[in-house]
Amino acid sequence: ANSASLTFGEPAFLGRDLNARIELFYRTTSYDQADYNTRSIGIAPSLSFPISENGRLTLSYRLAEDRIFDVTASSSPILRRDDGTAITSALGYSYTYDNRRSGLDINSGVVLRFGQDFAGLGGDITNVETTALAGYQTQVYNEEITLRATIEGGAVNSLDGQNTRITDRYFLSSRQMRGFEPLGLGPRDLAAPNQDAL
């Protein structure tokens, strides 16, 4: 997988505690373990602001062109159906509560995050993506060692009765689940000759 992005950020937009960002991105995948390739190109502006002492709300928009190509004849019909290009136009929000640097105990704290993206404002994709994250951090042995634990989950629900595309689904990376090759963990179509990850 390869990716390149260019991000412009202004942490004090309009002279206030408003974090304005705009990201231009280009990502490709070409795994030896998969008989298809992907390319995604797009733009994603966002605006983040505090709504409490430890809470911030982020409002975002994403416009992306996702292309799936080089799908082989031995791939699952699920993958062959996704072959081609689709435009995603999505509005989203994310709320983050983080007291790791401002809580009563300066050596420990939590971070909680919940967000949703609503695709369907134009484009070809109509779905809702919901994500949640919870993390805990503490320092031990005279603050010489930092321990962190994080749990994260998400779901993508189609709003028009169509199946989600492979570019909209989740894949665990080697940072999240060690001991597996790229695309080595996840659902498969066992009836397909190559049994590619779906």
Task: Specify the residue positions occupied by each region the protein language model found.
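C-terminal outer-membrane beta-barrel translocator/porin domains of Gram-negative envelope proteins
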Residues: 1, 60-198
